[in-house]
Amino acid sequence: MGKGELELAGFILSEAFDEKAEKEKVEKEKALKEKTEKEKAEKEKAEKEKVEKEKAEKEKAAKEKAAKEKAEREKSKSAVSPATTNQNSNKGNVEKGVAIGVLAGGAVTGVAVGGAYLADKYIASKAAGAAVNVIELTPIPNAANTANNAAAVSQGSHRWQPLPYYLFNI
């Protein structure tokens, strides 16, 4: 073998080794890249699961809080006594009674329709100078109309006289 042939064989071998080293380098880079991508995907998946878990816990806590508040509201509703409920509804009855009674011309002090709530105490606090203390839902004639009303009742009808304009504080 001549010198030129040896150089050529050495060159071919070095090229083969270089090619092999290049292939190994590319494979290592590819494996490293795949490993990095896999770790990144696992990390993202773990982060996503963590976020979903936190979200589920927050929703669960919100539902429990809402249920607790609802139970407390129901409990407080049931704690209101029937007397208080009647009292509140009687306030509305008193106001209706005043309106109906003033228009019909009857005024009387006493207990409002509906029972337990003393209407004169309620109206006295709301009256602000009004002449009428309490009006029942069933109008009672004022003194000026008593005779006319008695005659009308005896005839089978109940006719009311109009109220004087000065009672309305216009």
From Swiss-Prot:
Ranges annotated as biased composition (Basic and acidic residues): 20-77
Main location: membrane
Biased composition regions of type Polar residues, renumbered to the chain: 78-92
Record's keyword terms, sorted: Coiled coil, Membrane, Transmembrane, Transmembrane helix
Region (Disordered): 20-95
Regions that span the bilayer: 98-118
Record's bilayer topology term: Single-pass membrane protein
Top-rank taxon: Eukaryota
Keyword Transmembrane helix belongs to the record: yes
A GO-annotated cellular component: membrane
Subcellular location: Membrane
Coiled coil: 15-81
Protein name as it appears in the record: Putative uncharacterized transmembrane protein DDB_G0293028
Naturally occurring in which organism (per UniProt): Dictyostelium discoideum
Source taxonomy: Eukaryota, Amoebozoa, Evosea, Eumycetozoa, Dictyostelia
